[in-house]
Design a protein with these regions (language model features):
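Membrane-interface transmembrane helices that cradle and orient dolichyl/undecaprenyl
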Residues: 100-101, 105-106, 141-156
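Membrane-interface alpha helices of multi-pass inner-membrane proteins
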Residues: 47-50, 111, 144, 153-158
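Short helix- or helix-capping micro-motifs
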Residues: 19-21, 111-117, 123
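Transmembrane alpha-helices of multi-pass, membrane-embedded glycan-processing enzymes
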Residues: 66-70, 83-94, 134-137
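Short acidic/glycine- and proline-prone juxtamembrane loop motifs at membrane-interface regions
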Residues: 126-133
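Extracytoplasmic catalytic/substrate-binding loops of multi-pass membrane glycan-assembly enzymes
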Residues: 28-44, 53-68, 74-78
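Start-transfer (signal-anchor) and selected internal transmembrane alpha helices
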Residues: 1-25
Length: 158
């Protein structure tokens, strides 16, 4: 008997595989080919070590995240690139959950996988800066706003 489409379980498995491949590929490739961090990356780490409430050019969230992550897992290029890809994977996950609210499993999977061809989610995603941090923040914010309105629960607004 022929079935059309993929099941929700298969889609979740393929989405998990997609996240794993993306995370490994976009952590290894820049880690093997780039031997120094860009100036924004070094600036965020240096600022984050001070744990100040504000900085000259930017708000403190990103420097705090970078410094906290690198102090926890070690200061090296690999961990910085890994952090930038975790940021992108958080966005992919939020987009996946939101897409599942509207589309069948295969369509939601395609919606997320096709984002790999958008430069901000692939090769530009290796630079973690304030602009790229907004990719995950907007995705998560949009998801929670939708859930708050759809499910009428105050918890999603918090």
């Amino acid at each position: 008997m022929l079935t059309h489409g993929i099941t929700d379980r298969q889609a979740r498995g393929l989405f998990g595989l997609f996240l794993a491949v993306h995370l490994v590929m976009w952590t290894l490739l820049p880690g093997l080919t780039r031997h120094e961090l860009d100036s924004d990356s070094m600036m965020h780490f240096a600022w984050g070590q001070e744990w100040m409430g504000s900085y000259n050019l930017h708000p403190p969230l990103l420097p705090w995240i970078v410094a906290g992550f690198l102090q926890t897992f070690g200061v090296n290029n690999w961990n910085y690139v890994l952090l930038s890809q975790i940021n992108i994977c958080v966005a992919f996950t939020a987009i996946w959950v939101l897409a599942r609210q509207f589309f069948r499993p295969a369509q939601a999977l395609a919606a997320v996988c096709l984002l790999e061809f958008v430069p901000y989610y692939s090769f530009l995603g290796i630079r973690l800066n304030h602009t790229s941090l907004l990719i995950s923040l907007w995705a998560v914010g949009t998801l929670f706003a939708y859930l708050a309105v759809q499910r009428r629960r105050l918890i999603y607004w918090l």
